[in-house]
Amino acid sequence: NDIEASTLYRPENVQLDADDKENLKLMNLFDSHISQAFFGGKILIVEGDTEYSAFNYIREKESLSNEHYHDLNIIRARGKVTVASMMKVLNHFKNKYYVLHDTDTQQCLSKRINKDLSSDKHKVYDTITITNPAWTNNNKIKAQMTNKSRVIASLINFESAYFAETVESDKPENCINNIK
């Protein structure tokens, strides 16, 4: 007589704030396959399209001769802001998972309208240095790290870390060409 059991999870125990809930709703709208992360296999959360393209390409190539990759679920977070929200959910379900995200830079340049020099017909912008909003999400990701997660951060971004180059457009295509 084998005993079988199911584990029940209470959603109210997971500490999702309003931003987390909104992030996850938007993720589900963009990628309805996100739920595959909860149904077994290895889970790799990647920040964006470039990482997603790279790991899908590698998985497809490697899985031809290696069963190790057949149950790898690569989940595209579609931006760093969603990564920590996804980690909260996976932590709640006590899933083991991996995360790859960019560190980005601490500061970045932004443009602000110079009201003194601008008119209705002609806008003049000043370039200013600001705290990079993407950088602030690193602490949110770090706060969600557990013994069930392994988080790897690409210094500045994926292209700089692995290909030693800065790419402005066609990043996924450029990435695949570098891997080939």
Regions found by a protein language model. Give the residues of each.
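Acidic, divalent-metal-binding catalytic cores of TOPRIM
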Residues: 1-180
